[in-house]
């Protein structure tokens, strides 16, 4: 089998309502933007992967540089092709969707979902509903009640108020109302806060992170996510030593060397690599093994796009150290209907657990006509896409 073509397209899928991400510095998203890559072969099998699309950088990088590196190559030799994919970071944003497409192709050729090719571990994984917006306490209480009614066992809340005590009051009230009926995780989204950076919420230092972590311990929170900048290894390790609450992060760390450092320095009890933002899916499988060797959990981050979620689900289902799966859920903008718009089959949830699809490859099939209906024509004069 040989690769005969590599095609990248920018795709916009409209959302049912505007989405205001906590991590987006006041941005409004009216659609899900994806770079979708298709890798075709001489045997008629096509692999599909997807990554971010802030502009045309990924499309151009794949259709020019990476395409030339992959043509006429054996798609099963992914480790041999991986250096070219990794080096593409110099020419584009996130090239990891290309490795995902290769594994999708291999799984289809073998007639097996990718997680089974790697030995397989889980057919179902408990989900936690992951919030993505800020809202009033009343709306968040209704959100949690909605999750409980659906059988979802856990919710991740965001801390983005300039005064962390205000966020803590919200978390205290939700804990008071729901008690042990729901598990709570908390995401501070501080990993991108580098020296001199500014955003819509304040940057934490170690004393602030320590104060918040100790307050969350009293509320029986499962973990505190990204309380400090991602490369502040000393600060993260110092925080982890001083508190009992597990510290989580790693969604945009990249390279086995960084994940080895995260595992060895003990700054994170839970590592959260992402097949869209961090690394290729099999490289993250190696990172998860590093985490396992250091008695840590590896729970992929999945807030990106629906194809990215399905890719991370295949990774998670292959891991013995992945007790939870992140389910992005912020209705009305981001609800489960989006998966039925993009895929022939939507996500299957059963008693608070996501069912891992057994369809060959990455477990999904795009709806007929989806690409044609949502493809954005390439305008060389327009770099950003809104």
What are these regions (language model features)?
Residues 1-18, 25-34, 305-386:
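Flexible C-terminal active-site loop/helix
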Residues 3, 44, 98, 111, ...:
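Conserved, mostly hydrophobic/aromatic
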Residues 7, 40-109:
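Metal- or metallocofactor-binding catalytic centers and their adjacent structured scaffolds
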Residues 35-39:
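Short beta-strand scaffold segments in enzyme catalytic cores
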Residues 49, 127-130, 155-157, 184-188, ...:
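Hydrophobic faces of well-ordered beta-strands that scaffold small-molecule active sites
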Residues 68, 73, 229-357:
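Shared catalytic-loop signature of beta/alpha-barrel
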Residues 97-135, 181:
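Glycine-rich, aromatic-flanked loop segments that form ligand/cofactor-binding clefts
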Residues 124-243:
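Metal-dependent enolase-superfamily TIM-barrel catalytic cores that perform enediolate-based chemistry
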């Amino acid at each position: 089998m040989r690769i005969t073509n590599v095609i990248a397209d920018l795709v916009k899928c409209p959302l049912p309502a505007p989405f205001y991400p906590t991590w987006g510095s006041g941005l409004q998203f009216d659609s899900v933007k994806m770079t979708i890559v298709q890798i075709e072969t001489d045997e008629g099998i096509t692999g599909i992967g997807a990554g971010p699309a802030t502009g045309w950088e990924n499309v151009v990088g794949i259709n020019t540089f990476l395409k030339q590196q992959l043509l006429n190559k054996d798609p099963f030799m992914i480790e041999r092709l991986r250096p070219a994919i990794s080096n593409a970071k110099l020419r584009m944003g996130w090239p990891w969707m290309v490795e995902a497409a290769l594994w999708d192709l291999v799984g289809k050729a073998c007639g097996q979902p990718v997680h089974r090719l790697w030995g397989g571990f889980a057919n179902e994984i408990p989900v936690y509903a992951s919030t993505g917006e800020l809202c009033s306490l009343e709306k968040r209480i209704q959100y949690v009640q909605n999750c409980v009614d659906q059988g979802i066992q856990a919710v991740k809340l965001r801390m983005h108020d300039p005064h962390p005590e205000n966020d803590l009051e919200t978390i205290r009230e939700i804990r008071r109302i729901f008690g042990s009926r729901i598990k709570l995780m908390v995401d501070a989204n501080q990993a991108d806060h580098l020296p001199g950076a500014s955003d819509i919420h304040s940057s934490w230092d170690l004393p602030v992170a320590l104060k918040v972590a100790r307050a969350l311990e009293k509320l029986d929170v499962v973990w505190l996510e990204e309380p400090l900048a991602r490369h502040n290894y000393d600060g993260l390790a110092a925080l982890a030593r001083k508190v009992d609450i597990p510290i989580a992060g790693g969604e945009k760390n990249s390279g086995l060397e960084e994940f080895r450092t995260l595992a060895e320095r003990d700054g994170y009890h839970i590592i959260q690599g992402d097949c869209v933002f961090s690394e290729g899916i099999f490289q993250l499988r190696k990172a998860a093994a590093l985490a396992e060797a250091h008695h840590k959990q590896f729970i992929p981050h999945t807030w990106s796009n629906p194809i990215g979620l399905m890719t991370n689900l295949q990774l998670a289902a292959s891991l013995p150290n992945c007790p939870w799966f992140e389910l992005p859920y912020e209705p009305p903008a981001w609800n489960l209907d989006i998966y039925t718009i993009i895929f022939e089959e939507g996500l299957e949830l059963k008693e608070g657990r996501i069912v891992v699809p057994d369809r060959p490859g990455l477990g999904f099939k795009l709806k007929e006509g989806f690409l044609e209906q949502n493809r954005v024509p390439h305008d060389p004069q327009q770099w950003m896409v809104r």
